[in-house]
Amino acid sequence: MASREGKRRNHNHDDEKLVPLAALISRETKAAKMEKPIVRFGQAAQSRKGEDYVLIKTDSLRVPSNSSTAFSVFAVFDGHNGKAAAVYTRENLLNHVISALPSGLSRDEWLHALPRALVSGFVKTDKEFQSRGETSGTTATFVIVDGWTVTVACVGDSRCILDTKGGSVSNLTVDHRLEDNTEERERVTASGGEVGRLSIVGGVEIGPLRCWPGGLCLSRSIGDMDVGEFIVPVPFVKQVKLSNLGGRLIIASDGIWDALSSEVAAKTCRGLSAELAARQVVKEALRRRGLKDDTTCIVVDIIPPENFQEPPPSPPKKHNNFFKSLLFRKKSNSSNKLSKKLSTVGIVEELFEEGSAMLAERLGSGDCSKESTTGGGIFTCAICQLDLAPSEGISVHAGSIFSTSLKPWQGPFLCTDCRDKKDAMEGKRPSGVKVI
Protein backbone atom coordinates (compact mmCIF):
# COMPACT_ATOMS: atom_id res chain seq x y z
CA MET A 1 0.00 0.00 0.00
CA ALA A 2 2.82 2.40 0.80
CA SER A 3 4.25 1.51 -2.62
CA ARG A 4 1.02 2.17 -4.46
CA GLU A 5 0.69 5.45 -6.36
CA GLY A 6 -3.06 5.48 -5.87
CA LYS A 7 -4.33 8.85 -7.00
CA ARG A 8 -7.22 10.18 -9.01
CA ARG A 9 -7.79 7.80 -11.85
CA ASN A 10 -6.85 9.36 -15.19
CA HIS A 11 -6.44 6.87 -18.02
CA ASN A 12 -7.29 6.84 -21.70
CA HIS A 13 -9.55 4.17 -23.14
CA ASP A 14 -9.86 5.33 -26.73
CA ASP A 15 -10.35 2.12 -28.63
CA GLU A 16 -12.05 -0.29 -26.24
CA LYS A 17 -15.34 -1.37 -27.82
CA LEU A 18 -17.79 -2.74 -25.33
CA VAL A 19 -21.01 -2.24 -27.30
CA PRO A 20 -21.83 -0.55 -30.63
CA LEU A 21 -21.58 3.23 -30.55
CA ALA A 22 -25.20 3.65 -31.63
CA ALA A 23 -26.33 1.60 -28.65
CA LEU A 24 -24.18 3.66 -26.28
CA ILE A 25 -25.58 6.93 -27.64
CA SER A 26 -29.13 5.63 -27.34
CA ARG A 27 -28.62 4.55 -23.75
CA GLU A 28 -26.83 7.77 -22.87
CA THR A 29 -29.82 9.75 -24.15
CA LYS A 30 -32.22 7.71 -22.03
CA ALA A 31 -30.04 8.09 -18.95
CA ALA A 32 -28.96 11.68 -19.54
CA LYS A 33 -30.31 12.65 -16.17
CA MET A 34 -29.28 10.15 -13.52
CA GLU A 35 -31.67 10.59 -10.66
CA LYS A 36 -30.46 10.02 -7.13
CA PRO A 37 -30.83 6.42 -6.01
CA ILE A 38 -32.95 5.10 -3.19
CA VAL A 39 -30.82 4.00 -0.22
CA ARG A 40 -32.14 1.27 2.05
CA PHE A 41 -30.30 -0.46 4.86
CA GLY A 42 -30.52 -3.18 7.45
CA GLN A 43 -28.45 -4.07 10.49
CA ALA A 44 -27.99 -7.21 12.57
CA ALA A 45 -25.59 -8.25 15.33
CA GLN A 46 -24.83 -10.86 17.95
CA SER A 47 -22.67 -9.73 20.85
CA ARG A 48 -20.08 -11.73 22.75
CA LYS A 49 -17.71 -9.09 24.16
CA GLY A 50 -19.83 -5.97 23.65
CA GLU A 51 -17.10 -4.15 21.72
CA ASP A 52 -18.73 -3.78 18.27
CA TYR A 53 -20.46 -0.47 17.48
CA VAL A 54 -22.12 0.93 14.38
CA LEU A 55 -22.97 4.37 13.03
CA ILE A 56 -25.94 4.79 10.69
CA LYS A 57 -26.87 8.33 9.66
CA THR A 58 -29.02 8.90 6.57
CA ASP A 59 -29.76 12.61 6.97
CA SER A 60 -26.34 14.27 6.83
CA LEU A 61 -26.16 17.43 4.71
CA ARG A 62 -23.29 18.88 2.72
CA VAL A 63 -25.02 22.27 2.89
CA PRO A 64 -26.96 23.01 6.10
CA SER A 65 -30.74 23.30 5.62
CA ASN A 66 -30.51 22.09 2.01
CA SER A 67 -32.09 18.65 1.77
CA SER A 68 -30.92 18.21 -1.83
CA THR A 69 -27.35 17.88 -0.50
CA ALA A 70 -28.13 14.87 1.71
CA PHE A 71 -25.70 11.98 2.02
CA SER A 72 -25.65 8.82 4.14
CA VAL A 73 -23.00 7.44 6.49
CA PHE A 74 -22.61 3.80 7.52
CA ALA A 75 -19.78 2.58 9.73
CA VAL A 76 -18.62 -0.41 11.77
CA PHE A 77 -16.20 -0.08 14.69
CA ASP A 78 -14.81 -3.32 16.17
CA GLY A 79 -13.17 -2.48 19.48
CA HIS A 80 -10.51 -4.45 21.31
CA ASN A 81 -9.08 -4.21 24.82
CA GLY A 82 -12.30 -2.50 25.82
CA LYS A 83 -15.00 -0.48 24.08
CA ALA A 84 -13.79 3.07 24.77
CA ALA A 85 -12.05 3.62 21.42
CA ALA A 86 -14.99 2.26 19.43
CA VAL A 87 -17.46 4.48 21.30
CA TYR A 88 -15.28 7.58 20.98
CA THR A 89 -14.70 7.00 17.27
CA ARG A 90 -18.40 6.49 16.60
CA GLU A 91 -19.20 9.77 18.35
CA ASN A 92 -16.45 11.93 16.84
CA LEU A 93 -15.11 10.65 13.52
CA LEU A 94 -17.83 12.08 11.27
CA ASN A 95 -17.53 15.54 12.80
CA HIS A 96 -13.75 15.47 12.36
CA VAL A 97 -14.08 14.49 8.70
CA ILE A 98 -16.62 17.23 8.01
CA SER A 99 -14.51 19.84 9.79
CA ALA A 100 -11.60 19.03 7.46
CA LEU A 101 -13.67 19.93 4.37
CA PRO A 102 -13.63 23.54 3.14
CA SER A 103 -16.99 25.28 3.00
CA GLY A 104 -18.63 26.47 -0.19
CA LEU A 105 -17.68 23.49 -2.33
CA SER A 106 -19.79 22.16 -5.17
CA ARG A 107 -20.80 18.51 -4.97
CA ASP A 108 -18.02 17.42 -7.33
CA GLU A 109 -15.45 19.47 -5.40
CA TRP A 110 -16.74 18.02 -2.12
CA LEU A 111 -16.39 14.46 -3.39
CA HIS A 112 -12.92 15.23 -4.73
CA ALA A 113 -11.81 16.62 -1.35
CA LEU A 114 -13.41 13.83 0.67
CA PRO A 115 -10.56 11.25 0.56
CA ARG A 116 -8.09 13.68 2.09
CA ALA A 117 -10.63 14.85 4.66
CA LEU A 118 -11.10 11.22 5.69
CA VAL A 119 -7.36 10.88 6.31
CA SER A 120 -7.37 14.04 8.45
CA GLY A 121 -10.47 12.90 10.34
CA PHE A 122 -9.06 9.47 11.15
CA VAL A 123 -5.72 10.84 12.35
CA LYS A 124 -7.36 13.59 14.42
CA THR A 125 -9.72 11.07 16.05
CA ASP A 126 -6.77 8.84 16.95
CA LYS A 127 -4.70 11.74 18.29
CA GLU A 128 -7.51 13.06 20.47
CA PHE A 129 -8.46 9.64 21.80
CA GLN A 130 -4.85 8.86 22.73
CA SER A 131 -4.68 12.14 24.65
CA ARG A 132 -7.24 10.63 27.05
CA GLY A 133 -4.68 8.06 28.18
CA GLU A 134 -6.88 5.03 27.47
CA THR A 135 -5.34 1.95 25.88
CA SER A 136 -8.20 0.39 23.95
CA GLY A 137 -8.31 0.42 20.16
CA THR A 138 -10.76 -0.09 17.34
CA THR A 139 -11.07 -0.86 13.68
CA ALA A 140 -13.05 1.64 11.63
CA THR A 141 -14.76 1.09 8.31
CA PHE A 142 -16.48 4.31 7.33
CA VAL A 143 -18.72 4.51 4.26
CA ILE A 144 -20.21 7.66 2.72
CA VAL A 145 -22.92 7.28 0.08
CA ASP A 146 -23.67 10.42 -1.92
CA GLY A 147 -25.90 9.66 -4.86
CA TRP A 148 -24.25 6.94 -6.92
CA THR A 149 -20.79 7.68 -5.46
CA VAL A 150 -19.52 5.49 -2.63
CA THR A 151 -16.43 6.49 -0.62
CA VAL A 152 -14.96 4.00 1.84
CA ALA A 153 -12.17 4.53 4.38
CA CYS A 154 -10.86 1.79 6.65
CA VAL A 155 -8.29 0.79 9.24
CA GLY A 156 -8.27 -2.75 10.60
CA ASP A 157 -10.17 -5.74 9.29
CA SER A 158 -13.85 -4.76 9.24
CA ARG A 159 -14.39 -5.35 5.55
CA CYS A 160 -16.76 -3.64 3.11
CA ILE A 161 -17.74 -5.43 -0.10
CA LEU A 162 -19.76 -4.41 -3.15
CA ASP A 163 -22.15 -6.85 -4.83
CA THR A 164 -23.30 -5.59 -8.23
CA LYS A 165 -25.99 -6.87 -10.53
CA GLY A 166 -24.80 -9.99 -12.30
CA GLY A 167 -23.11 -11.41 -9.22
CA SER A 168 -19.74 -9.63 -9.36
CA VAL A 169 -18.34 -9.17 -5.83
CA SER A 170 -15.50 -6.73 -5.09
CA ASN A 171 -13.71 -5.71 -1.90
CA LEU A 172 -13.80 -1.95 -1.29
CA THR A 173 -11.41 -2.21 1.66
CA VAL A 174 -8.02 -3.72 2.47
CA ASP A 175 -7.56 -5.94 5.52
CA HIS A 176 -4.78 -4.61 7.76
CA ARG A 177 -3.97 -7.96 9.32
CA LEU A 178 -0.28 -8.66 9.74
CA GLU A 179 -0.89 -12.33 8.98
CA ASP A 180 -2.27 -11.58 5.52
CA ASN A 181 -0.71 -8.27 4.45
CA THR A 182 2.94 -8.47 3.41
CA GLU A 183 3.27 -4.75 2.66
CA GLU A 184 2.04 -3.83 6.12
CA ARG A 185 4.45 -6.28 7.78
CA GLU A 186 7.31 -4.64 5.91
CA ARG A 187 6.12 -1.16 6.85
CA VAL A 188 5.85 -2.01 10.55
CA THR A 189 9.30 -3.59 10.73
CA ALA A 190 10.83 -0.70 8.77
CA SER A 191 9.31 1.70 11.33
CA GLY A 192 10.88 -0.15 14.26
CA GLY A 193 8.23 -2.68 15.22
CA GLU A 194 8.74 -6.40 15.62
CA VAL A 195 6.40 -8.90 13.99
CA GLY A 196 6.08 -12.45 15.30
CA ARG A 197 3.78 -15.01 16.85
CA LEU A 198 3.06 -15.50 20.52
CA SER A 199 5.73 -17.70 22.07
CA ILE A 200 4.76 -20.09 24.86
CA VAL A 201 6.70 -22.48 27.07
CA GLY A 202 9.36 -24.32 25.11
CA GLY A 203 9.58 -21.64 22.45
CA VAL A 204 6.53 -22.91 20.57
CA GLU A 205 4.92 -20.17 18.49
CA ILE A 206 1.14 -20.06 18.26
CA GLY A 207 -1.60 -17.88 16.82
CA PRO A 208 -1.51 -15.17 14.14
CA LEU A 209 1.34 -12.78 13.49
CA ARG A 210 1.34 -9.88 15.92
CA CYS A 211 3.16 -6.59 16.37
CA TRP A 212 5.37 -6.23 19.45
CA PRO A 213 5.26 -4.56 21.89
CA GLY A 214 1.58 -4.97 22.56
CA GLY A 215 0.76 -8.11 20.60
CA LEU A 216 -1.82 -6.53 18.27
CA CYS A 217 -2.54 -8.55 15.12
CA LEU A 218 -3.58 -5.42 13.18
CA SER A 219 -1.21 -2.92 11.59
CA ARG A 220 -3.68 -0.02 11.49
CA SER A 221 -6.28 1.07 14.02
CA ILE A 222 -7.54 4.02 16.03
CA GLY A 223 -6.29 4.15 19.62
CA ASP A 224 -3.91 1.43 20.88
CA MET A 225 -1.51 3.91 22.43
CA ASP A 226 0.33 1.09 24.22
CA VAL A 227 1.45 -0.81 21.12
CA GLY A 228 3.73 1.66 19.34
CA GLU A 229 3.22 4.52 16.93
CA PHE A 230 3.83 2.28 13.91
CA ILE A 231 0.27 1.02 14.38
CA VAL A 232 -1.18 3.92 12.40
CA PRO A 233 -4.67 5.41 11.95
CA VAL A 234 -4.09 6.41 8.31
CA PRO A 235 -6.92 4.78 6.35
CA PHE A 236 -7.05 3.01 3.03
CA VAL A 237 -9.54 5.01 0.95
CA LYS A 238 -11.44 3.96 -2.16
CA GLN A 239 -14.06 5.92 -4.07
CA VAL A 240 -16.24 4.43 -6.80
CA LYS A 241 -19.23 5.52 -8.84
CA LEU A 242 -21.90 2.89 -9.36
CA SER A 243 -23.83 2.49 -12.56
CA ASN A 244 -27.51 3.38 -12.44
CA LEU A 245 -28.24 -0.30 -11.88
CA GLY A 246 -27.08 0.24 -8.29
CA GLY A 247 -25.49 -2.30 -5.98
CA ARG A 248 -25.36 -3.75 -2.48
CA LEU A 249 -22.78 -2.96 0.21
CA ILE A 250 -22.04 -5.39 3.04
CA ILE A 251 -20.08 -3.81 5.91
CA ALA A 252 -19.18 -6.14 8.76
CA SER A 253 -16.80 -6.88 11.60
CA ASP A 254 -14.40 -9.82 11.49
CA GLY A 255 -16.94 -11.97 13.30
CA ILE A 256 -18.51 -12.24 9.85
CA TRP A 257 -15.37 -12.41 7.71
CA ASP A 258 -13.66 -15.06 9.83
CA ALA A 259 -16.60 -17.31 8.97
CA LEU A 260 -17.58 -16.23 5.45
CA SER A 261 -15.68 -15.21 2.34
CA SER A 262 -16.80 -12.09 0.52
CA GLU A 263 -18.42 -14.18 -2.20
CA VAL A 264 -20.28 -16.43 0.24
CA ALA A 265 -21.54 -13.46 2.27
CA ALA A 266 -22.91 -11.82 -0.86
CA LYS A 267 -24.44 -15.01 -2.22
CA THR A 268 -26.11 -16.02 1.03
CA CYS A 269 -28.34 -12.93 1.12
CA ARG A 270 -29.16 -12.22 -2.52
CA GLY A 271 -32.83 -11.70 -3.21
CA LEU A 272 -33.55 -10.51 0.33
CA SER A 273 -34.34 -7.02 1.54
CA ALA A 274 -31.48 -5.16 3.22
CA GLU A 275 -32.93 -5.82 6.68
CA LEU A 276 -33.41 -9.54 6.08
CA ALA A 277 -30.06 -9.76 4.30
CA ALA A 278 -28.15 -8.44 7.32
CA ARG A 279 -29.88 -10.98 9.55
CA GLN A 280 -29.15 -13.79 7.12
CA VAL A 281 -25.44 -12.95 6.90
CA VAL A 282 -25.12 -12.98 10.70
CA LYS A 283 -27.14 -16.19 10.92
CA GLU A 284 -24.94 -17.94 8.35
CA ALA A 285 -21.73 -16.80 10.05
CA LEU A 286 -22.95 -18.13 13.40
CA ARG A 287 -24.04 -21.40 11.80
CA ARG A 288 -20.58 -21.97 10.36
CA ARG A 289 -18.37 -20.77 13.20
CA GLY A 290 -20.46 -20.18 16.29
CA LEU A 291 -20.41 -17.05 18.43
CA LYS A 292 -16.65 -16.72 19.00
CA ASP A 293 -16.54 -12.94 18.60
CA ASP A 294 -18.84 -9.95 18.30
CA THR A 295 -20.59 -10.39 14.97
CA THR A 296 -22.00 -7.28 13.29
CA CYS A 297 -23.31 -6.63 9.78
CA ILE A 298 -24.79 -3.65 7.91
CA VAL A 299 -26.31 -4.16 4.47
CA VAL A 300 -26.88 -1.09 2.29
CA ASP A 301 -28.85 -1.30 -0.95
CA ILE A 302 -28.33 1.51 -3.46
CA ILE A 303 -31.37 1.12 -5.68
CA PRO A 304 -32.41 2.84 -8.94
CA PRO A 305 -35.38 5.20 -8.65
CA GLU A 306 -38.77 3.59 -9.05
CA ASN A 307 -39.30 5.10 -12.49
CA PHE A 308 -35.95 3.83 -13.78
CA GLN A 309 -36.14 1.51 -16.78
CA GLU A 310 -33.26 -0.90 -17.07
CA PRO A 311 -31.54 -0.75 -20.48
CA PRO A 312 -31.83 -3.87 -22.64
CA PRO A 313 -29.00 -6.39 -22.21
CA SER A 314 -26.06 -6.21 -24.58
CA PRO A 315 -25.67 -8.94 -27.21
CA PRO A 316 -23.61 -11.88 -25.90
CA LYS A 317 -19.89 -11.47 -26.42
CA LYS A 318 -17.32 -14.11 -27.19
CA HIS A 319 -14.70 -12.58 -24.91
CA ASN A 320 -16.58 -12.82 -21.62
CA ASN A 321 -13.41 -12.77 -19.50
CA PHE A 322 -12.36 -9.51 -21.12
CA PHE A 323 -15.72 -7.89 -20.39
CA LYS A 324 -15.65 -9.08 -16.78
CA SER A 325 -12.21 -7.56 -16.32
CA LEU A 326 -13.73 -4.18 -17.14
CA LEU A 327 -16.16 -4.24 -14.22
CA PHE A 328 -13.96 -1.67 -12.48
CA ARG A 329 -13.20 0.83 -15.22
CA LYS A 330 -10.77 3.67 -14.56
CA LYS A 331 -11.81 7.27 -14.97
CA SER A 332 -11.13 8.76 -18.40
CA ASN A 333 -10.04 12.24 -19.41
CA SER A 334 -13.38 12.68 -21.17
CA SER A 335 -14.97 12.06 -17.81
CA ASN A 336 -18.50 13.42 -18.17
CA LYS A 337 -19.53 11.80 -21.45
CA LEU A 338 -17.72 8.53 -20.87
CA SER A 339 -18.95 8.37 -17.29
CA LYS A 340 -22.55 8.40 -18.50
CA LYS A 341 -21.77 5.77 -21.13
CA LEU A 342 -20.06 3.51 -18.61
CA SER A 343 -22.90 3.81 -16.13
CA THR A 344 -25.48 2.81 -18.70
CA VAL A 345 -23.72 -0.46 -19.45
CA GLY A 346 -23.39 -1.42 -15.80
CA ILE A 347 -19.71 -0.66 -15.19
CA VAL A 348 -18.46 0.55 -11.81
CA GLU A 349 -16.15 3.51 -12.27
CA GLU A 350 -13.19 3.72 -9.91
CA LEU A 351 -12.55 7.35 -9.04
CA PHE A 352 -9.86 7.12 -6.36
CA GLU A 353 -7.79 4.61 -4.43
CA GLU A 354 -4.92 5.16 -2.00
CA GLY A 355 -3.48 3.08 0.80
CA SER A 356 -0.15 4.70 1.69
CA ALA A 357 0.56 5.20 5.38
CA MET A 358 2.68 8.30 4.65
CA LEU A 359 0.89 11.56 5.45
CA ALA A 360 3.02 13.55 3.00
CA GLU A 361 1.53 11.42 0.24
CA ARG A 362 -2.00 11.37 1.61
CA LEU A 363 -2.41 15.06 2.39
CA GLY A 364 -0.93 16.09 -0.94
CA SER A 365 -0.19 19.59 -2.13
CA GLY A 366 -1.55 22.78 -0.67
CA ASP A 367 -3.76 23.51 -3.68
CA CYS A 368 -6.94 22.24 -2.03
CA SER A 369 -5.97 22.53 1.61
CA LYS A 370 -8.26 24.22 4.09
CA GLU A 371 -6.31 27.46 4.34
CA SER A 372 -8.05 30.61 5.49
CA THR A 373 -7.85 33.54 3.09
CA THR A 374 -9.69 35.92 5.38
CA GLY A 375 -7.52 38.01 7.58
CA GLY A 376 -4.04 37.93 9.02
CA GLY A 377 -2.53 35.19 6.86
CA ILE A 378 -3.87 32.51 9.19
CA PHE A 379 -3.40 28.87 8.19
CA THR A 380 -5.03 25.74 9.54
CA CYS A 381 -3.40 22.49 10.64
CA ALA A 382 -4.41 19.90 8.03
CA ILE A 383 -5.17 17.35 10.76
CA CYS A 384 -6.49 18.99 13.91
CA GLN A 385 -7.79 22.21 12.24
CA LEU A 386 -5.90 24.40 14.75
CA ASP A 387 -5.39 27.95 13.48
CA LEU A 388 -1.72 28.70 12.85
CA ALA A 389 0.25 31.84 12.14
CA PRO A 390 2.55 31.40 9.10
CA SER A 391 5.58 31.15 11.38
CA GLU A 392 3.97 28.31 13.37
CA GLY A 393 2.94 25.94 10.59
CA ILE A 394 5.27 23.11 9.57
CA SER A 395 4.84 21.81 6.03
CA VAL A 396 3.81 18.17 5.80
CA HIS A 397 6.58 17.85 3.19
CA ALA A 398 9.40 19.27 5.31
CA GLY A 399 12.16 16.72 5.69
CA SER A 400 10.19 13.93 4.02
CA ILE A 401 12.15 11.66 1.72
CA PHE A 402 8.83 10.31 0.46
CA SER A 403 7.55 13.64 -0.77
CA THR A 404 7.56 14.49 -4.47
CA SER A 405 7.50 18.16 -3.53
CA LEU A 406 10.77 20.08 -3.77
CA LYS A 407 9.25 23.02 -1.90
CA PRO A 408 8.94 22.10 1.78
CA TRP A 409 7.57 25.57 2.53
CA GLN A 410 4.38 24.69 0.64
CA GLY A 411 1.29 23.41 2.40
CA PRO A 412 -0.60 21.70 3.70
CA PHE A 413 0.73 22.59 7.14
CA LEU A 414 0.74 20.82 10.49
CA CYS A 415 0.93 22.09 14.04
CA THR A 416 3.84 20.94 16.18
CA ASP A 417 1.86 18.16 17.89
CA CYS A 418 0.55 16.75 14.61
CA ARG A 419 4.02 16.95 13.06
CA ASP A 420 5.36 14.95 16.02
CA LYS A 421 2.56 12.44 15.47
CA LYS A 422 3.48 12.16 11.78
CA ASP A 423 7.18 11.65 12.56
CA ALA A 424 6.42 8.92 15.08
CA MET A 425 4.14 7.05 12.68
CA GLU A 426 6.91 7.12 10.06
CA GLY A 427 9.56 5.84 12.48
CA LYS A 428 11.41 9.16 12.71
CA ARG A 429 11.41 9.17 16.50
CA PRO A 430 11.34 6.31 19.00
CA SER A 431 8.11 4.40 19.44
CA GLY A 432 6.57 4.67 22.85
CA VAL A 433 6.99 8.45 23.07
CA LYS A 434 3.34 9.41 22.91
CA VAL A 435 1.88 12.66 21.72
CA ILE A 436 -0.47 14.05 24.36
From Swiss-Prot:
Cofactor mode of binding and number, as noted: Binds 2 magnesium or manganese ions per subunit.
EC primary class: hydrolase
UniProt cross-references to SUPFAM superfamilies, sorted A to Z: PP2C-like
Entry's Gene Ontology molecular function annotations: metal ion binding; protein serine/threonine phosphatase activity
Domain PPM-type phosphatase, residue spans: 30-302
Residues binding Mn(2+) 2, per UniProt: D78, D254, D293
Pfam families found in the cross-reference section: PP2C
Co-factor(s): Mg(2+); Mn(2+)
Reaction equations catalysed: O-phospho-L-seryl-[protein] + H2O = L-seryl-[protein] + phosphate; O-phospho-L-threonyl-[protein] + H2O = L-threonyl-[protein] + phosphate
UniProt family annotation: Belongs to the PP2C family.
Name of the protein: Probable protein phosphatase 2C 15
Organism: Arabidopsis thaliana (Mouse-ear cress)
